[in-house]
Amino acid sequence: MESLQVLVVSMGRKDLSLANKMNFDCSAIIANQTDRCDYISERREYGLVEMYSTDTRGVGVNRNIALAAADAEFILFADDDISYYDGLKRNVLKAFSDEPRADIMVFGVDIVKNGEIAERRRHKDRERRIWNSMRFGTCVMAARREAIERNSIIFNTNFGGGCIYGSGEDSLFLKACFDCGLRVFSSSYVLGTCSKDASSWFTGCNEKYFFDRGALMGYLFPKMPHLMALYFAVNFKKETDIRCKKRISLMLAGLRAGKKLIPYSEYSTEEST
């Protein structure tokens, strides 16, 4: 059994050249969404690199494909815009060795924009609770595979890039981990750089964004979704031209729609008629 596998989600890949760009030093599984279904692999000096290509869509589906194929003791979730610093395997395994209570480990990352580091996301070595973990993205998380498998935890396929609702699969995954009693820790180790020059799915904090966040609140906070939707809309700090009253309206509409998995496209059509 491998000690660590990197589980990468990507799109439109034709070969394994992504492995060189990402600079991992352990076995890896690339889940590649494209227009074909096939499998290729290559044994390298540091481990086996595999790519499962499917004609599926949605980041949650893609992550679940990689997760189902994994067989290592520890798994590190990844996006294809990360480039790891040297010593990845050694440092990830050390983090779990230093904190044997951890089922999930969250790491730091340097955010790159226009070729320069624009933000350094750092964490202290500490245990996390659900209320201070919802901002962590999947691509900085590692896990004990057995803990995930034992509790049948998978990614929600209705949230995230390419899905009905544009984001939130990472928060829902972490919530599922907490709900199952898994323990989440953060590490001071920094994985590498993550390029944020462009996104294939994020189109800004527009009306769809708030609608989708409203739908997410119903799944993240089922006991108090209206309160959390109101809190998010009122305290929103990012740049947007949408006024607070409209943000609240959109989030409450999304909250209602999320119960029936109604997308923003249907809501916006009804609003315009």
Where are these regions (language model features)?
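N-proximal low-complexity "stem/linker" segments adjacent to membrane-targeting elements
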Residues: 1-29, 40
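Glycine-rich, basic loop-to-helix element that forms the pyrophosphate-binding segment
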Residues: 54-70
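Short aromatic/hydrophobic "clamp" motif used to bind/position activated sugar donors
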Residues: 75
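Conserved donor NDP-sugar-binding/catalytic core segment of glycosyltransferases
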Residues: 87-120
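Short, flexible, basic/aromatic active-site loop/helix in glycosyltransferases
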Residues: 116-146
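Catalytic beta-strand/loop signature of glycosyltransferases that borders the donor
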Residues: 155-157, 181-193, 205-206
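Acidic donor-binding loop at a coil-to-helix junction in glycosyltransferase catalytic cores
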Residues: 160-172
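Non-catalytic, C-terminal membrane-associated alpha-helical segments of glycosyltransferases
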Residues: 205-214, 218-273
